[in-house]
Amino acid sequence: MTEIRYVRLLTLVLASSVLLAGCSSAVPTTPVRSATPSAAATPTATPVVPPTVNPAATASLHAAARSGDAEAVRSALAAGAAIEDRGEGGRTPLVEAAKGNHVEAARALIEAGADVNAKDDIQDSAYLYAGAEGYLEILRMTLTTGADVNAKNRFNGTALIPASEHAHTEVVRMLIAAGVDLDHVNTPGWTAMQEAIVLGNGGAGAQDVVRQLLAAGANPDIRDSRGRTSLCNATRLGFGAIASQLRAAGATGC
């Protein structure tokens, strides 16, 4: 009886050992990764595809701008021309159109978003060309679409200075209304008033320019690079009518 109990007990012990060995030899599991990406993951950037530019259409755009063909300008733009492409002399199509006073071609370019402040190799923009040459309609378009009214040309002068020199009276009126700096001094040492006198002819146009500038508050007593005031120069050059205007405004002589 004792022997039988011993055999049963031994059998139970062996069975328990087998079970414990099976538990301890379980295959380790691989950690399961979350299906949700971590917050630090960087999304893949979508490549930026540049817009297609048509070189032939761009060449046609320059030609159309130079000749003033507004319809050809629109066709070239629709065909993929680069509106800010630089051609001869660093001129954009808009600068080319403005330089030739091609109003409708310039309008088509401006309506398409051309930069009215883009300058060519000699530092002239569509706005500056229009002011210097007296192209009133192009000047108006550039002013109403963001032209920098105090942009400077290669002589460090505003559009008002050459406009005054050439007695473009309506341009002068428009620039004054736009808020241009009346007393800016360019590299040669002249304000708009000085240039109207020194490089003008003293005629009716120059007189009107001086009158407008005085009425707008321009300072007639600023001296040029030789130390001469506007009245001094008007007197020296024999422009009696302008000298009288300046005296009436209380200007200082030499």
Swiss-Prot record:
ANK repeats mapped onto the chain: 56-85, 89-118, 122-151, 155-184, 188-222
Any one cellular-component term (Gene Ontology): plasma membrane
Cell compartment(s), UniProt: Cell membrane
InterPro entries per the UniProt record, alphabetical: Ankyrin_rpt, Ankyrin_rpt-contain_sf
Membrane-topology annotation of the record: Lipid-anchor
Residues with lipidation of kind N-palmitoyl cysteine: 23
Lipidated residue numbers (S-diacylglycerol cysteine): 23
Signal sequence, start to end: 1-22
Keywords attached to this entry: ANK repeat, Cell membrane, Lipoprotein, Membrane, Palmitate, Repeat, Signal
Entry protein name: Putative ankyrin-containing lipoprotein Lxx09580
Organism from which the protein derives: Leifsonia xyli subsp. xyli (strain CTCB07)
Classification lineage: Bacteria, Bacillati, Actinomycetota, Actinomycetes, Micrococcales
